[in-house]
Swiss-Prot record:
It comes from Lactobacillus johnsonii (strain CNCM I-12250 / La1 / NCC 533). SUPFAM superfamilies: P-loop containing nucleoside triphosphate hydrolases. This is Dephospho-CoA kinase. It is found in: Cytoplasm. Transmembrane segments: none annotated.
Length: 198
């Protein structure tokens, strides 16, 4: 039986580092962010829905969606963020479920489902267990500013639009703190794989 491990955490908490670890271990990953990017490419259903609603002002000269511009709109307006999620989440969910079915048919032992908004979008019900990557709020702001070249205000706006990490930690099956080095995180993830017997 395939064990589906939901992977979540806050923005800049270290999910990508965890993903890299699982890839090195040859564990398949269903990446919801990647799927969300793919459905917003020219010609895809998500692209049409988003451009129809938000208008052509969000487009680059080559007609691709300017994600920074779209982010600037939705992360400062909760109603518009809600609308963007309503337009894109069903398409992302559909693709995740299709990928899960393929892995189940191939009898994979363990599959990681990386969904930053796992609890917010009700995806935990599809997982056998949920891993939350935890980080302190100060470190989260610092890493996000560094990673995305955000101002402190932009970083705080992005973080405040997500469920508090403390809430995710309470609801998760497993919690791994990412407050040290990459090596520290990888050691904790190795221990976790042993714990779940994979």
């Amino acid at each position: 039986m395939t064990y589906f491990l939901g992977l979540t955490g806050g923005i800049a908490s270290g999910k990508s580092t965890a993903d890299e670890f699982f890839k090195k271990k040859k564990i398949p990953i269903i990446d919801s962010d990647l799927i969300a990017h793919q459905i917003m490419e020219i010609g895809q259903n998500g692209y049409k829905a988003v451009v129809d609603y938000f208008g052509t002002d969000i487009l680059n000269d080559d007609q691709t969606i300017n994600r920074r511009k779209l982010g600037g709109i939705v992360f400062n307006d909760k109603a518009k963020l809600k609308k963007l999620n309503e337009l894109t989440h069903p398409l992302v969910h559909q693709e995740i479920k299709q990928q899960m079915a393929r892995y189940r048919a191939n009898q994979e032992k363990l599959v990681v489902i990386d969904v930053p908004l796992l609890f917010e979008s009700g995806f935990e019900s599809l997982c056998n267990g949920v891993l939350a990557i935890s980080i302190t709020p100060e470190l989260q702001i610092e890493r996000l500013m560094k990673r995305n070249a955000f101002t402190k205000k932009e970083a705080v706006a992005r973080i405040s639009n997500q469920m508090p990490l403390s809430e995710k930690e309470k609801r998760a099956t497993y919690v791994v703190a990412n407050t040290g080095t990459i090596g520290d995180l990888e050691k904790k993830l190795s221990d976790l794989l042993q714990e779940i017997g994979r």
